[in-house]
């Protein structure tokens, strides 16, 4: 009984334990579920908070982006408005220029009409004079109609020539009295020419080799070295039968100089292959850039011109490698600067401005092979870009007479340029062409009636004409000089100007017995 009871109690205790355990585990499970639900709710709340924060951040970023786009659009609109305003200003300026040109043309037309009217009046006067003389000659006995006509024509011709000579003298006298610039220009052309070296113009450079075996190394396997060299430098490398020498050919002297330096470095180094060629060409390019800058600075020091923009100095230095008719353009610019400075000093005008304008007058020749356009226009654009004074810009654009000079210094630069180019030996000219030009000059002078002899002197800068005093009178000398000058202008090509000097000499001799 005791055992059975114990067993029953044990079973009941086990069942009770199971029931208690079940309810305990159920309670734990419910707690975990509630905890999980709370955690889930918290996650959802945190997620909502993060989403709200992200939303606000995105809104702020969107507003910033919209503000930035609006600012960019405003700037772009302002820039376009400025450009439109500039274009309107340019159009207005062009319109004003056209109006000024129209006014000038109208003035010239009026002047031409006035001159035509004067010519018509002169013609009427001549015709009236002819009629009067014919009436007089009809009364003269013993003269045929042809003889009377010849007498009248000869008298009219003589009177007309005298009237023309008087008019020309009056105009020249009036011009000399009223124009101070014209007087200064005449004075400036009388100053002695400045001497400088002549430089031969060439499109090739010769590089000496230590031996002919070096030619094969320069060519390289299947010509790869020479192809790489020509591609990197833009220069033709000519290898022929000339012993221990090769030739570099190019119209651009800067590229040719870079190629010469690079090739000489390669020959000294001995290692010639495409990679080494590229290194040496780059070094040579830097060397030439340094030389260009040094030459520009030396030119400024030599002419005492300071305050130029570094880029202008570099462009100026490039002129060291440019030649024109055998004349080094940088030396020519220095020469023009010095001559213009001397003229300005003699005339009491701005020496610094004249020297600065003279030094920069051919600036465009340094870049005319890189940018299309005449060298005068390129030089003016460069000077404007680097903020050169207005008078210096006028010196550049007026030195070939393309525009009117606005200051006396521009006229001096123009004169100095002509003097530098025209002085004997400045620019290379073959002896045959030089002699032919002088012969043509004398032939033109001798083609007129009444010429006793003529001589081309001052290297063709002056023609001296001796006339027969019994054929050419003093009033006819003025007409003769003008006619010779006009014929020279129409038939000859020459730099600068040619002076026509007509000389009439009377000699009287007698003998004492």
Curated annotation (Swiss-Prot):
The keyword Transmembrane applies. Its EC number is 3.1.-.-. Pfam families: HD, KH_1, RNase_Y_N. Keywords: Cell membrane, Endonuclease, Hydrolase, Membrane, Nuclease, RNA-binding, Transmembrane, Transmembrane helix. GO terms for biological process: mRNA catabolic process. It is found in: Cell membrane. This is Ribonuclease Y. The gene is rny.
């Amino acid at each position: 009984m005791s055992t059975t009871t114990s067993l029953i109690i044990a079973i009941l205790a086990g069942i009770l334990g199971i029931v208690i355990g079940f309810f305990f585990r159920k309670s734990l499970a419910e707690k975990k579920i509630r905890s999980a639900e709370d955690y889930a709710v918290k996650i959802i709340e945190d997620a909502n908070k993060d989403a709200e924060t992200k939303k606000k951040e995105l809104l702020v970023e969107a507003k910033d982006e919209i503000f930035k786009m609006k600012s960019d659009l405003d700037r772009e609109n302002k820039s376009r408005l400025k450009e439109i305003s500039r274009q309107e200003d340019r159009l207005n300026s062009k319109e004003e220029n056209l109006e000024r040109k129209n006014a000038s043309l109208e003035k010239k037309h009026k002047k031409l009409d006035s001159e035509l009217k004067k010519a018509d009046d002169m013609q009427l006067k001549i015709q009236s004079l002819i009629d009067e003389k014919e009436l007089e000659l009809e009364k003269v006995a013993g003269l045929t109609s042809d003889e009377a006509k010849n007498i009248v024509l000869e008298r009219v011709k003589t009177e007309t020539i005298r009237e023309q000579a008087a008019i020309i003298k009056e105009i020249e006298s009036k011009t000399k009295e009223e124009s101070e610039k014209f007087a200064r220009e005449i004075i400036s052309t009388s100053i002695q020419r400045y001497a400088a070296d002549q430089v031969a113009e060439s499109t090739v450079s010769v590089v000496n080799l230590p031996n002919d075996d070096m030619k094969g190394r320069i060519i390289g396997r299947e010509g790869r070295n020479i192809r790489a060299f020509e591609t990197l430098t833009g220069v033709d490398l000519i290898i022929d039968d000339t012993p221990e020498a090769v030739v570099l050919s190019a119209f651009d002297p800067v590229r040719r100089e870079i190629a010469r330096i690079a090739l000489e470095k390669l020959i000294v180094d001995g290692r010639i292959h495409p990679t080494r060629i590229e290194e040496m060409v780059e070094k040579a390019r830097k060397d030439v850039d340094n030389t260009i800058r040094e030459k520009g600075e030396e030119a400024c020091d030599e002419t005492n011109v300071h305050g130029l923009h570094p880029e202008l100095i570099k462009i100026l230095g490039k002129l060291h490698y440019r030649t024109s008719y055998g004349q080094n353009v940088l030396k020519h610019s220095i020469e023009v600067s010095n001559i213009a400075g001397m003229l300005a000093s003699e005339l009491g005008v701005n020496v610094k401005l004249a020297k600065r304008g003279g030094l920069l007058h051919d600036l465009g020749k340094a870049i005319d092979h890189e940018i299309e356009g005449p060298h005068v226009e390129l030089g003016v654009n460069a000077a404007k870009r680097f903020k050169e004074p207005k008078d210096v810009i006028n010196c550049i654009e007026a030195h070939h007479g393309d525009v009117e000079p606005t200051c006396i210094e521009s006229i001096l630069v123009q004169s100095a340029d002509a003097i530098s180019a025209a002085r004997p030996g400045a620019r290379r000219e073959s002896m045959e062409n030089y002699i032919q030009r002088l012969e043509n000059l004398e032939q033109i002078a001798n083609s007129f009636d009444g010429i006793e002899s003529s001589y081309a002197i001052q290297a063709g800068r002056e023609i001296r004409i001796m006339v027969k005093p019994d054929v050419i009178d003093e009033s006819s000398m003025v007409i003769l000089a003008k006619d010779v000058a006009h014929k020279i202008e129409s038939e000859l090509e020459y730099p600068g100007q040619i002076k026509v000097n007509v000389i009439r000499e009377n000699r009287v001799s007698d003998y004492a017995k």
